[in-house]
Amino acid sequence: MKRLLPLIATLFAIACCAAQNLRKVPLADPFILLYDGVYYAYGTGAGSGIEVWTSRDLSTWERAKGNARDGLALHRTDVWGEKWFWAPEVYRLNDKFYMYFTAEEHICVATSDSPLGPFVQETRQPMIADEKCIDNTLFIDDDGRAYMYFDRFNDGLNIWVVELEDDCTTLKKETMRPCIHVSQEWEKVWPRVNEGCFVIRRNGTYYMTYSANSYESPFYGIGCATADSPLGPWTKYDRNPLLQNPGELVGVGHSALFRDKAGNLKIVFHGHKSKGAIHPREMYITDVRFRSVEGGCRMEIDPGYSPALIAE
């Protein structure tokens, strides 16, 4: 046994070094779609559009060849905007795939027949043409009504909501209203930012995850607010943030919730490359749970995250 110990130690050291050298998926503002047994990850990263990655187990990922130009899922030649393609989310609606994304600090939507694209706009224009907005996300309630949440540039970045028409692209402008703004001490590091939200409904309560502080800050983190209606009013948890600087990670945020093949609720988010470098931001996944508390249930994010690794 004593002779085996040095060998075991050597093998363990080799395994640790190998794990540290595995490359992580370089996606910021990530979103995961599960469709037909395959996970599709979209995010900020490509300069001329939106790339897509695929996985069958959420652990190892491959850069997929998208059907748009240059192997992307969405290319700038098919949509409004020339640059700054950020924060895409993809949903299957009406037998098509809808991608909600930001281009040149304007919120847009494009459609495709495949999760690999090409995502195209028949009419090349943003959803709100006369105002800069970012980070649009879709929520469809149990009654079929669709809502879009997004960030507006007023007194920093604040999160707003608007109901959509049945086509999930046209705004009912009279329903537009604010949801949350910078209000808690942990959010006031720099600058004034509440952004990158995502909304789900559970047992009649609406849960909104969001990120606060600049994405460049090591104190970027994820908070939660709840409401009894998708239009609010929203109340932030008094014990926010739910996730900030877990383990060795810094700059964690811009998350999205999804369910895996077993139906478990998970959250995907990005973190900085390292404590000394922001870019490229990298994708991580962890579990989401609900704990019974006085007056209801509280969302919790497991700090035991897993990196999304590139299959070699």
For each predicted feature, which ranges?
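Hydrophobic h-region of N-terminal signal peptides that target proteins for export
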Residues: 10-18
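Carbohydrate-active catalytic/glycan-binding domains of CAZyme proteins
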Residues: 18-312
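Sec-dependent signal peptide recognition
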Residues: 2-10
